[in-house]
Amino acid sequence: MKEARMLTNPTLDQMQALGLTGMAAAWRELTEQSGTNELSRDEWLGLMLDREVTLRADKRIRNRLASAKLRFAQACIEDIDFAAARGLDRRNTMALAQGQWLTAHEGLIITGHTGTGKSWLACAFGRQAARLGHSVLYVRVPRMFEELALARLDGSFPRLIDRLTRVQLLILDDFGTHTLSDQQRFHLFEIVEERYQRKSTLITAQVPVASWHDLIADSTVADAILDRIVHNAHRITLRGESMRKQKSAPLLTGAENGEINQP
């Protein structure tokens, strides 16, 4: 590979000009390592392409995570503590982490009392979805309704609705903090109708699913919304006292328990 070493500078310039930063980095490392003279041209090219592919994949994940706006940006599946005292099933949780529910456009519902780690767990699944190649968006439901109401006034409603319905995984955090108004019912139905069997939606709530009908208030609209949200959704129920009361306990550790039900 003596000829290759002689062409290092112009070759690097060309790679940088083409945006092949991964290949350029691999080239530099290979030329500095001993023993690389024994590699064939195909082996050099393969190593360089591997680096470029990895770099671009990492960049896409970073971009998806930046767009997701996760509340707990560092939450990840690997950090869940599956202590026996908790009861959160490792097998079922890791099965969900494989992402088949996302490709099948199914939902995920996480319920539990305040402070039990619902939002953190939702963000961990959001990060995992981004790793698997899915676009993700996290929103708090009360804030979403505020933004939708304002969007109707300033003309940006179609653009905001499109953003909420187009993303491959929409995380709706803190659903059920209040009874929905007529406008909020309409907005929620608009979102779930557009997403039904096309995209995946993850919802967290303090109140159990059995109480959601009353929160939506209008019986006909509630039936329509819940039929689209609940029937094809996996469920996780977190139990235990608020983790905010456990001074040194990390998220999803300590006394809470969890159950996962398949749809």
UniProtKB/Swiss-Prot annotation:
Domain of life: Bacteria
Name the record gives this protein: Putative insertion sequence ATP-binding protein y4bM/y4kI/y4tA
Family under the similarity heading: Belongs to the IS21/IS1162 putative ATP-binding protein family.
SUPFAM superfamilies: P-loop containing nucleoside triphosphate hydrolases
Gene Ontology biological process terms, A to Z: DNA replication
UniProt entry keywords in alphabetical sequence: ATP-binding, Nucleotide-binding, Plasmid, Transposable element
Keyword Aminoacyl-tRNA synthetase in annotation: no
Binding site for ATP: 112-119
A GO molecular function held by the record: ATP hydrolysis activity
Organism: Sinorhizobium fredii (strain NBRC 101917 / NGR234)
InterPro entries assigned to the protein according to its UniProt record, in alphabetical order: AAA+_ATPase (IPR003593), DNAC/IstB-like (IPR028350), IstB (IPR047661), IstB_ATP-bd (IPR002611), P-loop_NTPase (IPR027417)
Gene3D superfamilies cross-referenced by the UniProt entry: P-loop containing nucleotide triphosphate hydrolases
